Amino acid sequence: MTSPYHISTHQDESTAGQAIVPPFRVDVEPEREFVRVCPSGEIDVATTGTVRERIADLMKEGFRRIVVDLRQATFLDSTGLRLMVDLDASSRSAGWRFAIIAGPAEVQRAFEVTGLLARLPFVDANDVTHGQGP
């Protein structure tokens, strides 16, 4: 017999014990002088390729000023860090401009513990919003 105050939840076997992860997506927001790339969700080995491909497509379209906005990212692993390092190196060698808008604390922690926070080109979101892109 079930108490009227008992709340039961149902999980099928495929999701039992697993955290529900929001879907990953990459939004692109062209601004006047640059393009903002906004990954949402976990940036990891399964999704980094999507971000890399989208930025490559934007480069082919002629964009030469790219801001990666991490404010909607929920996680960043070593492949995500590697992507940011690669984008920075590529921008320096190929003459295009790259910047990063910081993400939430759990994302920024990855940059802090690896020493990349001081090495990569982080910009303030307010500066970017007011037309001062990378």
Listing of model-derived features with the role each one plays in the protein:
Residues 1-74, 85-134:
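STAS-like cytosolic regulatory interaction modules
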